[in-house]
C-alpha cells in the first residue's frame, strides 16, 4: 500500500545519505580525492546495503545517524565549533533509539574523545560526553513516560538482557549462538517473573561455561562458528530477511515475468552468483582495512581510531550477545572508507616501487 511505498522511499533516502556520509567522512579524515571517489564506487558495489532497502527496520536510519555523529565529532576536532558537538550528541542518541546496539558507536566516539581531551585539554569534550549520557537516559525515560500516560498502564521491564547473553552461549537454530527462542520460551513458563528468568539465565550461563571449560576444543569450535557466521557471512542476511514470503502459484503473465527475476535473485542461479560477488567484496574490504590499520597505527590521530574501535567493540559484544550477521553489518559498511584508503596506500606503494626501480635501471645504464 501507500504506507509501505513511503517507507521504501525513506529507506532509499537512508541508503543515499549513508553513502553520502561515508564520502564526507572519507574526505574529512583523508583529504584525498581518489579515496573519496573509491568510497562512492565501493558503496555502490555493497549489494547487502542495496538489498536492505526492503527491510523496514531501524537499521539504515540508525547507520546514517551514527555516521552523522562520527562526522560532526571529527569535524569538531578540526574546526572547534561547539554546535558540531551538539549535532553529534543528538545524532548518536537518536541512532540509539533506533537500534540500542548503536551505544557501541557512542563508546567508540568517547574513546576518541578521551584521547583528544588528554592531548588538547578541551573542556567542551567533557560536556559533550556528559550530555550524551544525559540525553540517552532522558530520552528513554521520556518515551516510557509518554506511553505510560497515554495507555494509563505501566510498561513492564521486558525480556531481561541477560537472557540474550545466555542464548549467545547456546547452540542456535541456525548456528552457534543464534536465536533459539530461549528467552521467549522461558518467559511464559516462569509467568513473566523477571527475577526468576534472570536466575535461570545465570544458571544457563554457568552450565555453558562449565561445558566450555571441560571441552576446550568444543569451546573453540563454538566461538569460531559463531564468529564466521556473523562476520564472514557475505550477505549479512540481506537476502534472507528481504526474501518474498508469498506463494508463486496462480500468477498472471506480468507477475510471472517480474517473479522470474525475484526467483533468480533469491532462490536460483543468480542467487549463487550474487553471494559469490558479495564474498569477494567482503574479503576485499577486510583485507584493505587491515592494510589501512597496519599503515596508520603509528599516526597519533584520534579521529582515525573511531571506526576501528567501533569494529573491535562490536566484535567483542556480538561474540557475547545473541548472534545475527545483520547485527554486525553496520560495522562492515563503516570499514569502506578505511578499505578505500588502504587500496590507495597499496597503489602508492606500487607506484613508488616502480619509480625507484626505473631510477635504478637508468643509473645502471649510465
Predicted regions and their residues:
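Transmembrane-helix signature of polytopic, membrane-embedded enzymes
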Residues: 22-45, 303-307
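Membrane-interface alpha helices of multi-pass inner-membrane proteins
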Residues: 84-99, 131-139, 315-316
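Membrane-proximal stem/loop segments at transmembrane-domain junctions that anchor or position
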Residues: 147-254
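Short hydrophobic alpha-helices at membrane interfaces in multi-pass membrane enzymes
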Residues: 34, 40, 75-93, 123-128
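Membrane-interface anchor segments at the N-terminal boundary of transmembrane helices
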Residues: 2-11, 225-307
Amino acid at each position: 500500500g501507500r504506507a509501505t511505498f513511503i517507507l521504501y522511499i525513506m529507506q532509499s533516502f537512508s541508503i543515499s545519505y549513508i553513502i553520502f556520509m561515508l564520502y564526507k567522512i572519507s574526505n574529512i579524515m583523508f583529504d584525498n580525492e581518489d579515496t573519496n571517489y573509491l568510497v562512492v564506487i565501493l558503496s555502490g558495489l555493497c549489494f547487502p546495503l542495496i538489498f536492505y532497502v526492503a527491510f523496514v527496520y531501524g537499521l539504515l536510519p540508525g547507520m546514517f545517524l551514527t555516521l552523522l555523529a562520527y562526522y560532526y565529532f571529527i569535524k569538531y576536532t578540526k574546526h572547534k565549533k561547539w554546535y558540531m558537538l551538539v549535532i553529534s550528541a543528538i545524532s548518536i542518541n537518536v541512532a540509539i533509539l533506533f537500534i540500542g546496539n548503536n551505544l557501541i558507536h557512542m563508546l567508540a566516539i568517547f574513546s576518541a574523545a578521551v584521547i583528544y581531551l588528554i592531548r588538547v585539554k578541551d573542556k567542551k569534550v567533557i560536556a559533550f560526553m556528559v550530555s550524551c549520557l544525559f540525553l540517552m537516559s532522558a530520552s528513554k525515560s521520556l518515551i516510557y513516560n509518554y506511553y505510560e500516560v497515554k495507555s494509563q498502564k505501566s510498561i513492564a521491564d521486558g525480556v531481561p538482557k541477560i537472557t540474550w547473553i545466555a542464548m549467545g552461549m547456546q547452540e542456535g537454530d541456525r548456528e552457534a549462538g543464534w536465536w533459539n527462542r530461549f528467552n521467549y520460551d522461558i518467559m511464559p513458563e516462569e509467568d513473566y517473573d523477571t527475577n526468576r528468568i534472570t536466575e535461570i539465565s545465570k544458571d544457563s550461563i554457568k552450565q555453558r561455561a562449565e561445558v566450555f571449560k571441560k571441552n576446550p576444543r568444543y569451546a573453540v569450535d563454538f566461538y569460531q562458528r559463531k564468529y564466521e557466521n556473523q562476520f564472514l557471512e557475505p550477505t549479512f542476511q540481506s537476502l534472507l530477511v528481504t526474501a518474498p514470503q508469498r506463494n508463486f502459484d496462480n500468477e498472471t503473465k506480468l507477475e510471472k515475468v517480474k517473479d522470474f527475476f525475484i526467483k533468480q535473485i533469491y532462490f536460483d542461479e543468480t542467487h549463487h552468483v550474487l553471494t559469490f560477488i558479495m564474498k569477494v567484496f567482503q574479503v576485499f574490504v577486510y583485507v584493505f582495512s587491515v592494510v589501512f590499520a597496519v599503515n596508520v597505527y603509528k599516526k597519533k590521530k584520534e579521529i582515525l581510531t573511531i571506526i576501528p574501535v567501533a569494529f573491535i567493540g562490536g566484535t567483542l559484544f556480538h561474540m557475547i550477545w545473541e548472534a545475527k550477521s545483520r547485527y554486525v553489518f553496520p560495522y562492515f559498511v563503516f570499514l569502506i572508507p578505511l578499505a578505500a584508503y588502504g587500496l590507495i596506500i597499496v597503489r602508492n606503494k606500487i607506484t613508488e616501487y616502480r619509480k625507484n626501480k626505473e631510477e635504478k635501471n637508468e643509473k645502471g645504464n649510465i
